[in-house]
Amino acid sequence: MMIKTWLMLCFAGLIQAKNVLILLGDDVGFQFGAYGNTKIKSPNVDALAKRSLLFKNGFTSVSSCSPSRSVVMSGLPVHQNGMYGLHGGFMHFQSFNGVRSLPMILNQHNIRTGIVGKKHVGPDTVYKFDYEVTEEHYNLNQVGRNITCMKEYIRKFLQDSKNDSRPFLLYIGIHDIHRCYPYIGGKLGNFCDKFGDGMTPGTGYIKDWKPIVYKPEDVEVPYFLPDTPATREDLAAMYKTYSRFDQGVGLFMKELEDAGFADDTLVIFTSDNGIPFPFAKTNLYDPGQGEPFMVSSPYHKETWGKKTDAMASTMDIVPTVLDWFDIKYPKYKMNSKQVSLTGKSVLNALKPHVPPGPFDRVFSSHVFHEITMYYPMRVIRTKDTKLIHNLNFRAPYGLATDLYQNPTFLDILNRTESGQPTKWFTTLQKYYYRDEWQLFNLTSDPHEQKNLAGSAEYKNVFKSLKKTLNQWLLDTNDPWRCLPDEELEENGVCYPMDNRKFSDMQVNVLR
């Protein structure tokens, strides 16, 4: 008995405690030095990149806030977990009660969970953390943008964890750089860039934020936006908010280090969707689907400061965290079908030889953003091709409130109506009205402007991608998988919706 006890103590000393920190930005894109932007100052995110493996091919699984966060916390695409659109207010979308979320699974394995900042998902019975400081009980700007306030709550969680033998997951939902309501003319600025800057009367003061102010001529205009004075002023305000986001990342990483957890904590850094501009947020073109994605493992220091071509998605976060804690995903059913994760652990990308297959493609699924924005899309993206299925292609693409009430889009709209050159790489007509299927060769057409879906040359490529996409939709029990020309019946069969075949089906049913 004494020998057994001694062995247990001996091996317990060899076991490394493991924790996880998730840093999730809000509408954050690639505006960092680490991702090649030479105009912006982002020393803290760049420092994190130097102690991380940086994914050059990181993606969101859905380009919308609540849906994306539901995927981060459940590992299931939105058409499977039920969070079809925004959660807050009259939108009222939420996941199915039967979803087994990450905090729920970890709690069952004696792992402490905490969230500070923006949560924006429901129901609470599914997404329940042990420690919660979110917009559900506090002002969102204070717990999501006030980095000093956030620092104090994060410190509290980490200090409590020092006195707790359990490993932990801490999820930090930073509200920056989301646009600020009201979206035009508000005293806090279009990006809440004046909130707490200490320079604007009546907007407060955030002690730990040293605002960096940019002039319109100082910004880098991405290819998918028009290079106009309105766009540059809009981007300059966003850049200032990026400085608060970046300094927050530095503060939170320092709290982790000061608490003594830096050497045993996996850090995952990413965002929910692309920046809040046309062709990006709520779209599944690359500016909306592509995301910064970095993974810092204290046990894989040989990967620090390196970059990888491996493809990663927000759908991979749950499998990665479970792999880190050596926990198997539970067996259960929803809607009479077995539920399984279709993402993969990105810890495999930290190994010397990255396995092919799972890291060569990602999937995305979008249904709503706001409740009036019904525009379901399904996407498969490889390293050199992308196939988009627009299920509601007969309708115009809907615009989110913060995406039409902003200086950049209003300038495009006004120039179009007055007949002036928009300086945009596309037109409003093409932006609103899209083909049912869009196939892009990302090597020759990285800006996704030439649709090859009807090309004879790409017939086999189209067929192969469509087959793989449809299999994923079947595996994830997508209730939209028969649309737009067929209807999914309860027996899982797709029935055509034209009158003749529908009449035949009625006759067969009557018989």
What are the functions of these language-model segments?
Residues V71-L170, H175-D176, C180-Y183:
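Catalytic-site neighborhoods of secreted/periplasmic enzymes
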Residues F55-N57, T303-D309, I327-L347, P356-S364, ...:
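Acidic/polar loop patches that form or flank catalytic/metal-binding clefts of enzymes
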